[in-house]
């Protein structure tokens, strides 16, 4: 089973994504609520896929920092962004930094699973 790290400051959102993935039965789920936890888990557990929220603090798009740090460690990492940010420039920036996908909130389970299917 592939390890998937879900990174979101919202416990509700982590639970929601976790439930979607658990129904598939193909993933071991890891969770982090912020940048430091995310990087510790990424370094120690080496997840196959990271599902990453951009806005994990009120003042910054901390997810961009996490994405950048992950790509410095492993430029082939599969990072899927989930975010309520709809600005095309932000989406383009995430892809340029190495994200493999960008899913807008509210998350549609079918869309998430379709994106993940590409990396099974």
Where are these regions (language model features)?
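C-terminal output helix
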Residues: 89, 107-116
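The short loop immediately C-terminal to the conserved phospho-acceptor aspartate in CheY-like receiver
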Residues: 55-57
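Two-component/phosphorelay signaling modules centered on CheY-like receiver
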Residues: 11-30
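Alpha4 helix (beta4-alpha4-beta5 surface) of REC/receiver domains from two-component response regulators
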Residues: 61, 86-101
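Short amphipathic alpha-helix used as the core "switch/output" element in two-component signaling
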Residues: 40, 62-75
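Acidic, metal-coordinating helix/loop segments flanking the phosphotransfer/catalytic sites
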Residues: 31-49
């Amino acid at each position: 089973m592939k390890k998937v790290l879900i990174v979101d400051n919202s416990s509700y959102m982590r639970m929601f994504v976790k439930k979607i993935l658990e129904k598939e039965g193909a993933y071991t789920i890891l969770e982090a609520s912020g940048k430091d936890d995310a990087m510790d888990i990424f370094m120690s557990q080496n997840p196959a896929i990271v599902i990453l929220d951009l806005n994990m603090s009120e003042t910054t798009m901390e997810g961009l920092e996490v994405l950048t740090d992950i790509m410095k460690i492993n430029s082939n990492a599969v990072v899927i962004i989930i975010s309520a940010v709809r600005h095309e420039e932000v989406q383009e920036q995430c892809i340029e930094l190495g994200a493999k996908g960008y899913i807008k909130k509210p998350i549609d389970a079918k869309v998430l699973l379709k994106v993940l299917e590409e990396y099974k």
